Amino acid sequence: MSELRSELKYLESHEWARVEEDGTVTIGITDHAQEALGDVVFVEVPEVGSQVSIGEEAGVVESVKAASDIYSPVSGEVIAVNEALEDAPETVNSSPYDDGWFFKVKPDDLDELEKALSMEDYKAAIESDD
């Protein structure tokens, strides 16, 4: 069973979002997603200073099996990207919720995350897919 964390919000497209103490949002892909993808070999993230929109493509993750778009769970300005993934994309496999995060956003409206799934709802969604 994939690891899930109760403090995160989830998208059905398998991204997670964590609201930080300063109100920014950190985004990555779920443990379930990295397991399905297999060995991650490349991650493309948006540029710092760029704008992302809720539900819109914000990047790409590539594995030995497939390439998958990354969608943003909130609209806002990208304020940081995980540059370590450029040299070590496999970190997404070993630490999807910690060291394997993709980018951070200063959200235009934090209430947009209300549209995301709780851990329980995401768990039900992935179990119905299996």
From Swiss-Prot:
Signal peptide: none annotated. InterPro entries: 2-oxoA_DH_lipoyl-BS, Biotin_lipoyl, GCV_H, GCV_H/Fam206, GCV_H_sub, Single_hybrid_motif. Its cofactor is (R)-lipoate. The keyword Chloroplast does not apply. Keywords: Lipoyl. The gene is gcvH. SUPFAM superfamilies: Single hybrid motif. The glycine cleavage system is composed of four proteins: P, T, L and H. This is Glycine cleavage system H protein. The lineage of its organism: Bacteria, Pseudomonadati, Pseudomonadota, Gammaproteobacteria, Cellvibrionales.
